Amino acid sequence: MPMTFTTCISAQDFGLASETMIPGFQASQLSCAAPAQVVPVDPCHVFDESFLQDLVLWWTWPDTRIPLYIAGPTGCGKTTSVLQFLARVHVPVISLTCSRRFVKDDLVGRWGAHEGGFAWIDGPATIAWKTGAVLLINEFSLAPPEV
């Protein structure tokens, strides 16, 4: 489902001395259900301008089904920068980390015991799809190929 932006956020809110406006949402507009959360803005976070331009390009791309793959050394700020970008455009995020034992059910959901029977329990990808949250997957390359 395509996103419909409702406001524009100044690039100055991202620490840039630019007059560029970045589409986003009003803070009070989006609600989120667990495990999604709107990350608080860290006013001390400094964006790499080139990285931020790539995020904005992805964010404003017309086809919302296109995933964004970010690579870089451990600790260089990939996850933090994405979370801080989403905080500033007021979008809930569901974050998870893959491992070699990660299975498709960990992502999509599974049937589980519930009140004497069975019920479908949504996984993070399903919750993100239903709620409009961004799904942030760390260490995706560690997941088995079938995931």
Residue locations for each model-derived region?
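AAA+ P-loop NTPase catalytic core and its hallmark functional loops
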Residues: 2-147
